[in-house]
Structures are given as C-alpha cells and as structure tokens.
Amino acid sequence: MVNVPKTKRAFCKGCKKHMMMKVTQYKTGKASLYAQGKRRYDRKQSGYGGQTKPVFHKKAKTTKKIVLRMQCQECKQTCMKGLKRCKHFEIGGDKKKGN
C-alpha cells in the first residue's frame, strides 16, 4: 500500500526553488482518432476480410507503474515523477500510527 500526501514540497523549475506542490495521479489521455497509426489501422480494417492485425493476449504484468503529476501552487507549472510498481495506491490517506 503506497500512501502519498496531497501536497508536497519539491523543486519547481519555474520558480527555481522548492515550493509546495499539489499531487495528483497521472492518467492517460483519450487516444486521438486522427493519429497516423489509428488512421492506417482504420483504413486497413475497413471493407471485407475481418481482423487484419494480431490481437494481443499475452498480458505479462499485473500492476502499472505509478506516475505522480505535481503542480506548483505559485506558478502552476507541472512536472511528473515516476514511482515503482504497486498494487494499491492512495493519495492523502490516513497516516500509519506508530506503536
């Protein structure tokens, strides 16, 4: 279980010093319909003949690498930071209590 605080002090390239950053999890954007590969694929798929390219089935990984998107609260500049793989990820969860 990885628990990351909602705000974090980190170096900002815009301000050129350590600032408070707002932390969110990076999500992949929607794939464009007009990218060259998608246009080529759609052209090949159209007409008779069924599936033209192999459909990938051999999934090897069970987790994804976590990417944090950090935004400076002063200048709004963003930067990404990659983390290791983990099954459970949480932003701003309760802290673990010590003994």
Swiss-Prot record:
One GO-annotated biological process of the protein: response to cycloheximide
Stated consequence of mutating P54S? Confers resistance to cycloheximide, an inhibitor of polypeptide elongation
InterPro entries of this UniProt entry?
Ribosomal_eL44, Ribosomal_LSU_eL42, Ribosomal_zn-bd
Result for mutant: P54L: Confers resistance to cycloheximide, an inhibitor of polypeptide elongation
In alphabetical order, the GO MF annotations are: structural constituent of ribosome
Q: What Pfam families has UniProt attached to this entry?
A: Ribosomal_L44
Q: Look up the record and report any one GO term of the cellular component aspect.
A: ribosome
Q: Does the keyword Ribonucleoprotein apply?
A: yes
Ordered alphabetically, the record's keywords are: Antibiotic resistance, Cycloheximide resistance, Ribonucleoprotein, Ribosomal protein
Alphabetized PANTHER family for the sequence: 60S RIBOSOMAL PROTEIN L36A/L44 (PTHR10369)
- Can you tell me which family this protein belongs to? Belongs to the eukaryotic ribosomal protein eL42 family.
- Protein name per Swiss-Prot or TrEMBL: Large ribosomal subunit protein eL42
Its lineage opens with: Eukaryota, Viridiplantae, Chlorophyta, core chlorophytes, Chlorophyceae
Designated gene of the protein: RPL44
